[in-house]
Amino acid sequence: MTHPIFMVGARGCGKTTVGHQLAQALGYDFVDTDLFMQQTTNMTVADVVAQEGWHGFRQRESLALQQVTSNRCIIATGGGMVLAEANRRFMHDKGTVIYLHADAELLAQRLEENPQDNQRPTLTGRPIAEEMADVLAAREALYRGVAHHVIDASQAPEAIVASVLKALRLSAA
């Protein structure tokens, strides 16, 4: 298997952490679409949203997805990457999509424990636990619909990587 592996899920589910470890385990490259965008625009996600709005950000996000996709690469996508049907189709057709599933309470806890200065701005302006519940309610079907494999992301990163590797081996058999 050499095609790209796309990591999808809400903020805080572990896409970047797990993606790095998975890339090491497989000998693949690793790219985070948000970090790629920040490096190519010299702006944080919050800056892009402030200057161009969410629509402009989503357009940049879709372009970044296409630019970074290559064989033997793990791609950690932004939590909203699945909102565009074209992105879902692209990821599903070009590689294997892994959905790292975690409940809203765990996501909020992780985001509160590890706040980032350049973290995406709030979508709703409400407390993070409420926002994550709303985000999952709106996106859960999209994450599951695009995914080739759904992985429980409530475990430690090493256990999640082991679960992903097992799922990939089973699908390759």
From Swiss-Prot:
Top-rank taxon, per record: Bacteria
Database matches in InterPro entries: P-loop_NTPase (IPR027417), Shikimate/glucono_kinase (IPR031322), Shikimate_kinase/TSH1 (IPR000623), Shikimate_kinase_2 (IPR027544), Shikimate_kinase_CS (IPR023000)
Catalytic activity, EC: 2.7.1.71
Known pathway: Metabolic intermediate biosynthesis; chorismate biosynthesis; chorismate from D-erythrose 4-phosphate and phosphoenolpyruvate: step 5/7
Binding-site positions, substrate: 34, 58, 79, 139
PROSITE patterns noted in UniProt: SHIKIMATE_KINASE
Record flagged with keyword Magnesium: yes
Cofactor details (free text): Binds 1 Mg(2+) ion per subunit.
Pfam families tied to this protein: SKI
Subcellular location: Cytoplasm
CC terms in the record's Gene Ontology section: cytosol
SUPFAM superfamilies cross-referenced by the UniProt entry: P-loop containing nucleoside triphosphate hydrolases
Single GO MF descriptor: magnesium ion binding
Catalytically driven reaction(s): shikimate + ATP = 3-phosphoshikimate + ADP + H(+)
Main location: cytoplasm
CDD domains found in the cross-reference section: SK
Span list, region LID domain: 112-126
Binding site for ATP: 12-17, 120, 155
Domain notes: The LID domain closes over the active site upon ATP binding.
Family, per entry: Belongs to the shikimate kinase family. AroL subfamily.
HAMAP family assigned: Shikimate_kinase (MF_00109), Shikimate_kinase_2 (MF_01269)
Quaternary structure and partners: Monomer.
Name this polypeptide is given: Shikimate kinase 2
Organism for this UniProt entry: Pectobacterium carotovorum subsp. carotovorum (strain PC1)
